[in-house]
């Protein structure tokens, strides 16, 4: 019951924080419609690559791990986790490199918004972090430690909200309110937030590995 309450509270907090930074970006002077267009165009490409690299991963791994644990095969559950970690780590790394090195082409030819190039570069590392995190989430869910993934998601959203506002304000001050740089800064915040979630899941696993199994 406590785990369900934690997850419910986490989801509510995530939605509230998401609303806060969305309203901030929409109403921030110098960002406005132009900034949102740059931000959104880059984010759409990022979301597409993210879908390819990690869609359905947590649920699939959770199912496989729980099936192994149900028959007492703890080593099998851990083997599934390690294979998935290596596999999706490689897929995430490829996605990151595609977005990083292809940012110029994507911005000028696909989105036809040249200003989105920096946004794409800023987002590229997030694909790797999210791909790895999705494997950890599936593993922990399969072991019924749902609170861990809820905390990681909440931590990510807290960092995203705080860092988005902080970085955009700093960039606006330094660049005299450059819309392009502010949009890129907002997506740097997204990347740092995904890293915070990855770091939490990784450290939890390292510190509790023997206890977990």
Per-range role (PLM):
Residues 26-48, 115, 179-188:
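Interfacial/gating helices of multi-pass transporter permease domains
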Residues 101, 112-136, 162:
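Alpha-helical transmembrane segments of multi-pass membrane proteins
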Residues 59-104:
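Membrane-water interface segments that mark the loop-to-transmembrane alpha-helix transition
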Residues 42-64, 88, 125-128:
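Small-residue-rich midsections of specific transmembrane alpha-helices
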Residues 130-152:
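Membrane-interface junctions at transmembrane-helix termini in multi-pass inner-membrane proteins
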Residues 1-20, 75, 79:
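N-terminal membrane topogenesis motif
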Residues 94-117, 173:
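Short membrane-interface helical motifs at transmembrane helix boundaries
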Residues 147, 158-199, 203:
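Membrane-interface helix-loop junctions in multi-pass transport and translocation proteins
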